[in-house]
């Protein structure tokens, strides 16, 4: 599933095409994806102007001049694909409709944005912009890891007395939103903290080091266009390439990349997800 860097990469690719654009025509080609689409979604989108394109956690939020916000969740395999007349200095013709093109937005400037989702774990919803923080997918989210509210004091307090493993705690979207398996594994390796360690038993000074490390990992991943392991593509269709710099994720049995460390990377399943770590460097 796309994590924060992949979603932010897609948002940045869409922003030049969607922000300020009027949706001249919207087409919805099926009644649902993971959940049913809102009533009359195509009609409510047609004629609306996108005033801002934002990201919250792993969701893209398109604010409309109608007072509604379009929430987009990419799910496991969802892609937002741009074609048409305006993508910076590029020109992409509209491709023939594909089997899994579920939502199509045509702008008045000649661009087309297509939401393609083969597995149909993605979602779209419309909500009142003024009360969007109360939407059931958004209301319990913790602070953004790249925002000021995510700081050392917050994380130390969130971990205090917590019995779950540190990796599980970091994946808890109520503690910090947007983090996923890949980037938590990478951040814990950089911090030298085992994903198996009980969160509440890690010294506060070590917990505090996670904040800048998490920010660095996410920032580097965004700059690299995210990680393309299976389905992720940027809005222009390009692959991300952060996967080429992984230090632990997906490297089971390979040598740790810490200088002078001869240990091999281990994999352990935690809460249904694979954790990758070095047993020597991460304590």
Swiss-Prot record:
Name of the protein this chain belongs to: Formamidopyrimidine-DNA glycosylase
Which positions are catalytic residues? 2-3, 58, 273
CDD domains in the record: EcFpg-like_N
Name of one Pfam family that matches: H2TH
Catalytic activity, per the record? Answer: Hydrolysis of DNA containing ring-opened 7-methylguanine residues, releasing 2,6-diamino-4-hydroxy-5-(N-methyl)formamidopyrimidine; 2'-deoxyribonucleotide-(2'-deoxyribose 5'-phosphate)-2'-deoxyribonucleotide-DNA = a 3'-end 2'-deoxyribonucleotide-(2,3-dehydro-2,3-deoxyribose 5'-phosphate)-DNA + a 5'-end 5'-phospho-2'-deoxyribonucleoside-DNA + H(+)
Enzyme Commission number: 3.2.2.23, 4.2.99.18
ZnF (FPG-type) spans are 247-283
Which PROSITE patterns does the entry mention? FPG_CAT, ZF_FPG_1, ZF_FPG_2
Alphabetized NCBIfam families for the sequence: fpg, PRK01103.1
């Amino acid at each position: 599933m796309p994590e924060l860097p992949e979603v932010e990469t897609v948002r940045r690719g869409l922003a030049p095409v969607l922000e300020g654009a009027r949706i001249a025509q919207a087409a919805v080609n099926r009644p649902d994806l993971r959940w049913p689409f809102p009533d009359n979604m195509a009609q409510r989108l047609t004629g609306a102007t996108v005033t801002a394109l934002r990201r919250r956690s792993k969701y893209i939020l398109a604010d409309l001049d109608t007072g509604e916000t379009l929430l987009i969740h990419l799910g496991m395999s969802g892609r937002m694909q741009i074609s048409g007349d305006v993508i910076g200095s590029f020109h992409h013709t509209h491709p023939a409709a594909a089997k899994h093109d579920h939502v199509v937005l045509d702008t008045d400037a000649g661009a087309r944005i297509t939401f393609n989702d083969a597995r149909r774990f993605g979602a779209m919803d419309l909500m009142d912009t003024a009360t969007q923080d109360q939407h059931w997918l958004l209301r319990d989210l913790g602070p953004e890891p790249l925002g000021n509210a995510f700081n050392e004091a917050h994380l130390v307090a969130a971990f205090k007395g917590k019995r779950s493993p540190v990796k599980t705690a970091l994946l808890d979207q109520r503690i910090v939103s947007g983090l996923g398996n890949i980037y938590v594994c990478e951040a814990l390796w950089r911090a030298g903290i085992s994903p198996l360690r009980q969160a509440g038993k890690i010294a506060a000074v070590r917990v505090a080091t996670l904040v800048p490390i998490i920010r660095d990992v996410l920032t580097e991943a965004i700059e690299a266009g995210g990680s393309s392991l299976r389905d992720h593509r940027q809005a222009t269709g390009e692959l991300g390439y952060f996967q080429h710099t992984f230090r632990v994720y997906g490297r089971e049995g390979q040598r740790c990349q810490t200088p002078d460390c001869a240990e091999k990377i281990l994999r352990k399943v935690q809460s249904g997800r694979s954790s990758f770590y070095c047993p020597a460097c991460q304590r």
